[in-house]
């Protein structure tokens, strides 16, 4: 049975710039915002955009990500004529081969895509924080009779050299793609979100590999090939909140922005919910002696200290005399007495001993998942 559009989320990245936080988990599985993981935003956008069939392409440390996604029920992807499929490298007659790039990962999953029989494929990165209506992007793609549509957003020209830049004509037709140009001609940065006509993309990928011209990456290989061939390639301008949280600084910055009541993400918007897989925990408990100001405190938390402008994920335990400020504490962490944590990210299930100081002065301080720092005399 044919479908109109298949979503493919690229979620195999190692995320080396996140250091300790991706030692044992893929970047899209890194927690965010107190109750989410990064991939929840792409999955929720699919759910809200009526994209009913989604393939999640994984590779590096996929166990946490696989368990989190499960059968896709939190995103409504577990019903009739809908579903989510985890796509990992596998052994075939051609042998076993790791994904070598973004478009190579799609090429390796041609059999799955053919089974879904889509007219269009929506390619997404699984490691960005944003809300976006993919249906509106598809309508633009159809109206302009595009072969490829690339979602872009304007960035400050002085920062454009950090991105893949799309140079367009007056009708937003892309006439040139430049990967991190030293002297950018435009400030339209690619968001790594693409809509392709599947039959044409399939043809380009198969022809490239069969002729010894491998199409390994969308930015470096596929998009330039489309432009050179004179295909109808258009930019789709996005004007909402979008953050690539691939570094410690950007993850911390986006987490702190999450605490702003005027944040463009507007997580309380009932018309565009962000869904997630969450375990059921007891209610939070905040003692009479504690002080909590401008903070998100998750279910199952016990707070007997001071928490200012910070995020506590589920089941975080904060003992007496401890101060947490401008920090993101991931789930399951136990923090002892008289601890000072400022400008920091603490990984899941970490244990912070009594009288410990974790202060990010010139850069954000990071404690990894399950890391132990100091000793807790009252650890539970």
Swiss-Prot record:
Keyword Protein biosynthesis included in the entry's annotation: no
Stretches of the chain forming a coiled coil according to its record: none
Superkingdom, taxonomy of origin: Bacteria
Biological process (GO), any one: glycogen biosynthetic process
Substrates-to-products reaction catalysed: alpha-D-glucose 1-phosphate + ATP + H(+) = ADP-alpha-D-glucose + diphosphate
EC class: transferase
Record's protein name: Glucose-1-phosphate adenylyltransferase
UniProt lineage: Bacteria, Bacillati, Bacillota, Bacilli, Lactobacillales
């Amino acid at each position: 049975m044919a479908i109109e559009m298949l979503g493919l989320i690229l979620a195999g990245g190692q995320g080396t710039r996140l250091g300790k936080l991706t030692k044992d988990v893929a970047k899209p599985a890194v927690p965010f915002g107190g109750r989410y993981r990064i991939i929840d935003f792409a999955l929720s956008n699919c759910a809200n955009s009526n994209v009913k069939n989604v393939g999640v392409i994984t590779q590096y440390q996929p166990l946490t990500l696989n368990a989190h996604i499960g059968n896709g029920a939190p995103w409504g992807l577990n019903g009739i004529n809908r579903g989510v499929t985890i796509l990992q490298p596998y052994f075939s007659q051609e042998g076993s081969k790791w994904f070598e790039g973004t478009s190579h990962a799609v090429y390796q999953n041609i059999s799955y895509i053919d089974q879904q029989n889509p007219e269009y494929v929506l390619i997404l990165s699984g490691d960005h924080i944003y809300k976006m209506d993919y249906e509106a992007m598809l309508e633009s793609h159809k109206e302009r009779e595009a072969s490829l549509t690339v979602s872009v957003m304007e960035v400050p020209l002085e920062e454009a050299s950090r991105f893949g830049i799309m140079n367009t004509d007056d009708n937003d037709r892309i006439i040139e793609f430049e990967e991190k140009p030293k002297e950018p001609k435009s400030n339209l940065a690619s968001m790594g979100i693409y809509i392709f006509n599947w039959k044409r993309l399939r043809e380009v990928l198969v022809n490239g590999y069969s002729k010894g011209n491998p199409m390994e990456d969308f930015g470096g290989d596929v998009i330039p090939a489309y432009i050179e061939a004179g295909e109808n390639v258009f930019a789709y301008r996005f004007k909402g909140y979008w953050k690539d949280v691939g570094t410690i600084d950007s993850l911390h910055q986006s987490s702190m922005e999450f605490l702003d009541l005027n944040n463009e993400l507007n997580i309380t918007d009932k018309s565009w919910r962000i869904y997630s897989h969450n375990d059921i925990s007891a209610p939070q408990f905040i003692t009479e002696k504690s002080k909590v100001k401008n903070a998100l405190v998750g279910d199952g938390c016990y707070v007997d200290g001071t928490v200012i402008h910070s995020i506590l994920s589920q089941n975080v335990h904060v003992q007496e005399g401890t101060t947490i400020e401008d920090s993101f504490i991931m789930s399951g962490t136990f923090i002892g007495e008289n601890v000072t944590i400022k400008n920091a990210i603490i990984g899941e299930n970490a244990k912070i001993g009594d009288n410990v100081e974790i202060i990010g002065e010139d850069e954000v301080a990071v404690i990894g998942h399950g890391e132990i720092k100091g000793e807790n005399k009252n650890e539970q």
